[in-house]
Swiss-Prot record:
PANTHER family: MITOGEN-ACTIVATED PROTEIN KINASE. It comes from the Eukaryota. This is Mitogen-activated protein kinase MKC1. The modification Phosphothreonine is found at residue 211. The lineage of its organism: Eukaryota, Fungi, Dikarya, Ascomycota, Saccharomycotina. One of its GO terms (molecular function) is protein serine kinase activity. Its EC number is 2.7.11.24. The TXY motif contains the threonine and tyrosine residues whose phosphorylation activates the MAP kinases. Dually phosphorylated on Thr-211 and Tyr-213, which activates the enzyme. GO terms for biological process: cell integrity MAPK cascade; negative regulation of glucose mediated signaling pathway; negative regulation of mitotic cytokinesis; positive regulation of calcium ion import across plasma membrane; positive regulation of calcium-mediated signaling; regulation of fungal-type cell wall biogenesis. Residues 28-339 form the Protein kinase domain. Its cofactor is Mg(2+). It comes from Candida albicans (Yeast). The active site is at 174 (proton acceptor).
């Protein structure tokens, strides 16, 4: 298509990438295609408006730059063809904005939607993100030699990003080498939040958020497949353990051909779980299957990874436990002796507010989600075109407002709980309750350094449990038939989407 037709797309240039139209801000030129898949296309692009000057504020002024600036532009396609794709896109937009500024989470620079000039409709979104040189999967697959300090640095950075994510009560749920972006200086950033979900200490509030779980099988926590009675932030720690094992061994540790084979490979390494763990499996078919298998002893990590640092194996042992209750937390992992060379409290910051999933996860209509996406794009485009100082001020105000709302919500919950426990006191004057005089620092403003700021874009900016039957009932059980195997595979593949007790 002739570039002269670009004005019908509101000043954007039209490119052909993988035989699809790739319509981007005319100030950018496509450098090369980075990849494509079921959900879209990614290209690298260079900022170039002819003068090789990058605008640094919303007044259109420009500043000289020795090197042109590069970005990764991701086109998410067919977002309104299915509810699940639309919700995934909305989740990605909101979370990338929410976590924007943390050094170990990919930075979102801009958003764009391209309406059809005739109908005004759109079915795709463009995300402008910081460009990284490769991902962890490519590094491991290349076979290039890495030192133990490389492993330490990579895992430490993953945990720093995950600590920030978990502190906002968010589960990533799709951590894998392909979702860890890396630069030549070994800087690492977590990407792809399309499968993320909220987390609550109240299990009843988590039950509805485990649908549409299709994370990569090799890095999926066993409690998801086995339908444990609850799921926690430990599911992400399992994935980090799988990544550490892959770094140490140069290949994935659990490479199941299907979900039943995946479970078999996990049990071959971790051994037969104790009865107390089996009883927490929500899927009775999975319980019966595990009990039908021969008793297996736990494998030795020293034999699996003979050249590995013993401290790395100790951390791996604590990450890869079948029972999620025994798995190390992200905070304890950061303090593990294996990572002490990199340990820096200033790098291990926590998010000061909780992410609000309820505002959109309960929305299922395509029209409603479409409007939410349009609103998100418009608000973010306006935000990133403000001067950096104003962005920081707005972000600080939003954080403080959200923290105050969450403080009030927690007070209301505590008051309701007190009234439930002491119904005779329900009629007491609210002014006499102890909560009015409760001292708290939840709403106290923190110093500015506690908040990750919008990144100073030096290179470019867009500014212008039920108990199971006893074990002896199953010890003589035969292996499942072909039909039972298929049913088990279906159940393990759906995990908590299928069975939640």
């Amino acid at each position: 298509m002739d570039q002269q037709e670009a004005p019908i797309y509101y000043g954007r240039s039209v490119n052909k990438v993988y035989n699809q139209e790739f319509i981007i801000d005319s100030r950018f030129k496509i450098v090369k295609e980075l990849g494509h898949g079921a959900y879209g296309i990614v290209c690298s692009a260079k900022y170039d408006n002819g003068s090789k000057k990058v605008p640094d504020s919303n007044n259109g002024n420009a500043s000289s730059s020795a090197n042109a600036s590069f970005v990764a532009i991701k086109k998410i396609t067919n977002i309104f063809s299915k509810n699940i794709l639309c919700k995934r896109a909305l989740r990605e937009l909101k979370l990338l904005q929410f976590f924007r500024g943390h050094k170990n989470i990919t930075c979102l620079y801009d958003l764009d939607i391209i309406p059809n000039p005739m109908t005004g409709e759109f079915n795709e979104i463009y995300l402008y993100e910081e460009l990284m040189e490769c991902d962890m999967h490519q590094i491991i697959r290349s076979g290039q030699p890495l030192s133990d300090q490389h492993y330490q640095s990579f895992i430490y950075q993953v945990l720093c990003g995950l600590n920030f994510i978990h502190s906002a009560d968010v589960l990533h749920r799709d951590l894998k080498p392909g979702n860890l972006l890396v630069n030549a200086d070994c800087e690492l950033k977590i990407c792809d939040f399309g499968l993320a979900r909220g987390f609550s200490e109240n299990p009843d509030e988590n039950a509805g958020f485990m649908t549409e779980y299709v994370a990569t099988r090799w890095y999926r926590a066993p409690e998801i497949m086995l339908s444990f009675t609850n799921y926690t932030k430990a599911i992400d720690i399992w994935s980090v353990g799988c990544i550490l094992a892959e770094l140490l061994g140069g290949k994935p540790l659990f490479r199941g051909k299907d979900y039943v084979d995946q479970l078999n490979q996990i049990l071959m390494i971790l051994g037969t779980p104790p009865e107390s763990t089996l009883q927490r499996i929500g899927s009775h078919r999975a319980q019966n299957y595990v009990r039908s298998l021969p008793i297996t002893r736990k494998a030795s990590y020293e034999e699996l990874f003979p050249d590995a640092n013993p401290l790395a194996l100790d951390l791996l042992e604590r990450m890869l436990t079948l029972d999620p209750r025994e798995r190390i937390t992200v905070r304890d992992a950061l303090n593990h002796k294996y990572l002490e060379l990199w340990h820096d409290p200033k790098e291990e910051i926590e998010c000061q507010v909780k992410f609000d999933f309820k505002s959109f996860e309960t929305v299922d209509g395509l029209d409603e989600m479409k409007q939410l996406i349009m609103d998100e794009v418009q608000k973010f485009r306006e935000f990133v075109r403000k001067p950096i100082e104003e962005q920081q001020r707005i972000q600080m105000q939003l954080h403080m407002q959200k923290r105050e709302e969450q403080r009030q919500e927690e007070e209301e919950k505590e008051l309701l709980e007190q009234q439930r426990q002491f119904p005779a006191q329900e009629s007491m004057d609210i002014s006499q309750t102890p909560y009015n005089n409760l001292e708290t620092n939840i709403g106290t403003p923190q110093v500015e350094d506690d908040y990750p700021r919008p990144q100073e874009l030096d290179e470019f900016t867009f500014s212008n449990l039920e108990s199971s039957s006893s074990m002896n009932l199953f010890q003589d059980m035969a292996k499942p038939s072909g039909e039972e195997y298929i049913k088990l595979e279906e159940e393990l593949g759906f995990g908590l989407d299928w069975c939640y007790v």
